């Protein structure tokens, strides 16, 4: 008889930028690595490397000079299943060192994902990896489990996509979910672009990684953008140095807050979309008038692109300006929000009430991929 510990469910949050994977019941993911697959530019150049045809995650990053990179997930949706399969293979066998056929696997997906995407995910889990049981849960429902609040409005912003998801009594309200194809990767691109104004050029995918690092270390959100710009003209207090991998040191100033400002003003990068504050407001306004007070009073931030210092205060200020004046606005930025979707999945997969959500291999064999729409919410 297998030990209960051996059948811990695996939880895999496949982000556009990073894969977060680990075991249900843990409080943080064991493996966090970039969602990239690199292939050698020229076959046969790497002598004695025992030439692999593909490298995944950190290994692809460390060999960046000789590989071309691909991101199999764009805007939260898988666009290259062969590469995605490589990422999952790497997750199970190299990172977690488990045999997927012995575990239930919980995968997360972006809300409003195409149905075919969800079917294909399930199919690969059963047919390629022979998983014991699988389930797909929408990212936000998972984030809610971590927040433990009955009614909340979740703003989840990752690398490829942002969503606002109102949650009431533990359920996401699908009619009010709004999707914004603006997230971390766009901010990285924008930072690279405004750095060219200073005469620095970052164009290759490897250089973009340096810019991402700079963004994560130095960017912040201004409470008042115009005021911050004025301040920069008269003082150098905003300026910070950043050392590039080759030892060159560059100085950045206003770029630090001009970069994530795009979240509030997408028009800066030519996007005709509402900012994250307005999208959150629109999403709340799509809900029943009786629950809006609860949603305004519990706006929960989640995902890596909500990690910028100053985001909660700015969000609070912007939503207060949009909402009725009597409304009490509270923006919550939990410290573990970078992994809140994964943590929520970990909690969810270990709940006894979740056990009926798993799709067993036998059910899949009988009904085919479409079973995923009946069982997963």
Swiss-Prot record:
GO terms of biological process kind: cell division
Lineage of producing organism: Eukaryota, Viridiplantae, Streptophyta, Embryophyta, Tracheophyta
UniProt key word Hydrolase: yes
Source domain of life: Eukaryota
Keywords, in A-Z order: ATP-binding, Cytoplasm, Cytoskeleton, Hydrolase, Nucleotide-binding
The protein's name: Actin-75
InterPro entries, alphabetized: Actin, Actin/actin-like_CS, Actin_CS, ATPase_NBD
Note: There are at least 13 actin genes in potato.
Gene Ontology molecular function terms on file: ATP binding; hydrolase activity
EC number of this enzyme: 3.6.4.-
């Amino acid at each position: 008889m297998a030990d209960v510990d051996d059948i811990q469910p695996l939880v895999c949050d496949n982000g556009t930028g990073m894969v977060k994977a680990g075991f249900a019941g843990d409080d943080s993911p064991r493996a966090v690595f970039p969602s990239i697959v690199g292939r050698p530019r020229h076959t046969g150049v790497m002598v004695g490397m025992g030439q692999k045809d593909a490298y995944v995650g950190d290994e692809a990053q460390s060999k960046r000079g000789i590989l071309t990179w691909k991101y199999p997930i764009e805007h939260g949706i898988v666009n290259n299943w062969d590469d995605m399969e490589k990422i999952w293979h790497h997750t199970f066998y190299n990172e977690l060192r488990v045999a997927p056929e012995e575990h239930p696997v919980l995968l997360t997906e972006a809300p409003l994902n195409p149905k075919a995407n969800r079917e294909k995910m399930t199919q690969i889990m059963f047919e390629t990896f022979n998983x014991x049981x699988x389930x797909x849960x929408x990212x936000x429902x998972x984030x809610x489990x971590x927040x433990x609040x009955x009614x909340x409005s979740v703003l989840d912003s990752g690398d490829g996509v942002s969503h606002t998801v109102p949650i009431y009594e533990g359920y996401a309200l699908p009619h009010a979910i709004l999707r914004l194809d603006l997230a971390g990767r766009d901010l990285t691109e924008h930072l690279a672009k405004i750095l060219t104004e200073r005469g620095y050029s970052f164009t290759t995918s490897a250089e973009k990684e340096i810019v991402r690092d700079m963004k994560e270390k130095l960017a912040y959100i201004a409470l008042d953008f115009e005021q911050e710009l004025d301040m920069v003209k008269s003082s150098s207090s905003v300026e910070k140095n950043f050392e590039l991998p080759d030892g060159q040191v560059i100085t950045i100033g206003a770029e630090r807050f001009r970069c994530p400002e795009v979240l509030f003003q997408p028009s800066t990068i030519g996007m005709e979309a509402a900012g994250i504050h307005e999208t959150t407001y629109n999403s709340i306004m799509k809900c029943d008038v009786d629950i809006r007070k609860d949603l305004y009073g519990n706006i929960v931030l989640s995902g890596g692109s909500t990690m910028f210092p100053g985001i909660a205060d700015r969000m609070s200020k912007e939503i207060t300006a949009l909402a009725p004046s009597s409304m009490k606005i509270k923006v919550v930025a939990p410290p573990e929000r970078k992994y809140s979707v994964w943590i929520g999945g970990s909690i969810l997969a270990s709940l006894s009430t979740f056990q009926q959500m798993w799709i067993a291999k036998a059910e899949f064999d009988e009904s085919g991929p479409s079973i995923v729409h009946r069982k997963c919410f």
